[in-house]
Amino acid sequence: MLARLMLLNFFLQASIATVDPYTQLFLRNKGYSYSLVGIIYAVGQVASIIFPIIFCMVSDKTKKTKLLFLLMAIGSLGFVVAALNNSLFLTFVCFFVASACLWTINPMNDGYQNRVLNGDSSKYGVARAIGTLGYVVCLVVFGLSGFPDETSNKSITLAIGLALLLFAVASAFAPQDRVHGTTASEEASEKANEKASEKPTASNTPAANSQPTRKKGFSFSWFNSKFYIIMGIVFISRIAESVVDKMLSSYLTEELNLGSHFSLLVALGAASEFVMLIVGGKLLQKGKVHPYTLITLSALGLTVRLLIYRFFPTTLACVFAAMLHSLNFAALHIGLSKYISQNVNEEHYSLAMSLYWAVATNFPEMIGTLVGGFVIDAYGYPTLFASYAVLPAIAFVLFVVFRKKLRG
């Protein structure tokens, strides 16, 4: 089972490696300004805010996650059309649809894996790390081979299509989703032995599994105050994360003139993420580090990373900055995933992760990319890095202020 999850994660992240670093590039290849690219990104981010919540609720309720993976892969091909067409309107539409599909997969996959692995953060960390390995391998191959050509949209879209095809195949071999801690094939057996096998955990207490709660489409009572506080603070930090996730590729290719080798720097960041996912997952599972600690360190890491870009605009400095991806993304993601598994009932895992991705990641990144495009056009990248570094610094201070509440 774990091996099939690893395969799924490998090709999922390989698909993202063909889309995420190259999206800004194929839009710039079409002659669009930074401001227009920021607006297109913002439209896509709107889709990635709304649709993950909807589709993840469907996944939670139906457990038809493998079918949903396939549908999301097909919809993500909209990036191909967005890159190749000559209509600005069609570019907006296709970018919207493709963003809705691609950025639904991650939160859906997180909730799905939490159910299949019963919240085991060590195994989850391994599975996610293999996904990161797929991301790294893909970008290293790109950087060394020169494929895809970052100046050719046809080359970029060929890579996107191949990667999504491999992910679709891997999803067909993924394990069946679990229904409240069991596989679908075991559900009937569990129901027959329900009274004997029930354990008094938060996820299957009468209150958590009561029928009235299930009938609601959504209820704020499903999540405690700590969940909402931490989402709010992460929101602030993730506005600045948009620089790394959405606007760094053009900086590396146009300002530092790295050409196709820019993907090697992105791969280096992903490699450091790989290490954090493995080590951090094991430390979390053994209780040697609190999820709050990793989440807090992520804000500090992002602050330092942006300041490095601002004051040391060299390739060597960017190498060090890329390694901080282990903190500003990996530490946050694995820490928050564990935090959610500890504070959210199992039946709401996917929804909780979709709220993290949609409301605390994609929405603030929408704001960040929209404003950032205008900042780059008007003032340049140095001002962007300096101004955005303030946000994770504020988040770090807030994490310290709410330490007792969030660790309690």
What are these regions (language model features)?
Residues 1-48, 226-265, 333:
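Helix-loop boundary and gating motifs at the non-cytosolic
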Residues 10, 88-106, 235, 317-331:
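Hydrophobic core of transmembrane alpha-helices in multi-pass small-molecule transporters
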Residues 50-63, 146-147, 276-290, 376-377:
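Helix-to-loop junctions at the C-terminal end of transmembrane segments
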Residues 66-80, 293-308:
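Structural signature of the two symmetry-related core transmembrane helices
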Residues 96-130:
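Cytoplasmic helix-loop-helix junction between adjacent transmembrane helices
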Residues 155-172, 384-402:
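Symmetry-related core transmembrane helices of the 12-TM Major Facilitator Superfamily/SLC fold
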Residues 174-232:
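Juxtamembrane intracellular "pre-TM" segments in multi-pass secondary transporters
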Residues 348-378:
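A late C-terminal transmembrane helix in Major Facilitator Superfamily
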